[in-house]
Amino acid sequence: LNGVLKLLDTLTTKSVTLDPALVSLIKTQAQQFLATLQPVAPAPTTISNTIIPPAPRTLPLTVLFWEGPIARAYLATLKSMGLKPDKIIHLVSKNDLVTQKPIGRFVPRYFKLAYAHSRQKNSIHYWSSTLQKNENTLYRAMRSTIENGLKFPPSVIDDALALVELSEYSPHIETLMIDNLSDNVLHEYLSKLQQTQILFTGGGIVPTKLLEIPTLKFIHIHPGHLPEVRGADCVLWSNLMMGRTSATCFYMAPGIDDGDVILASYLPPLTPRLHIAQRDIKTLYRATYAFFDPWVRGFVLRQALIETDGFTRISATPQVEATSVTYHFMHAQIQHAVFSKLFADI
């Protein structure tokens, strides 16, 4: 269904003549199907943060920091537990994230890094900042759900949104300017690291050459229960197909969300209280990835840290490929169905 709806959009964009009756039939049938769709199976028992947390300390962990809501949620979560990664590798893009053109070609060399970082930070957090100002009711509804449903204190969320200096989270900060994650500068730097675990925070698809560095293990939090909910927009697909938000902490391997699982879990019920009938789908989608998705991941990161004593006692389990399902970016009509079920109308 997702593919058919996307195909209709593509054909319309290319000005291909379509039978209006057929288009109407497809959209009507899709709407009826989505209205009656039931989750594949009842979600298993959820986890809760009830185990004694690890003692406050510096962890043998390196954070590969790519500025954004996810990275900020991770660092705020670690800090709230009294934990600090041994090192943060701060990745700064040489190129504008929108135009992909080089940044600061005429800026003096000694200003270039700070300028590039400022541009990157402003670009990535644009929607978070804008929605807090222009869609405050929506922001507050999502924030309240995170605070009450996932038990993140207001101070932790405030810390993530403050965008403070990275030195607040780790004693050692290294900064690299790169074109992208395939940049040889990054590969050469990581290849020289002592044996460690890398907490990945985003920035694109991790190239195989990085995952194959023998001294490193990359840890990722995926917003879906692996291997049943793989791919893109899984914070939405998990709600639609499984009836519950979920996430998985795992060791990365080449492939889409491949690798041994450290912790996979369905989360407590999350239902923001807000009337959304007249709200724009794009706004709801942007708010989901600014305020909801990062803390879904942060919740499972927190539990994984608790259950593995700060990633020092890990027993990872291979994924069962027979149960794997890969999802793709969700069409707006399906998004509408998900948001209608996710939000509690008031």
Feature annotation, model-predicted:
Residues 5-12:
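TPR/TPR-like (Sel1-like) alpha-helical repeat modules
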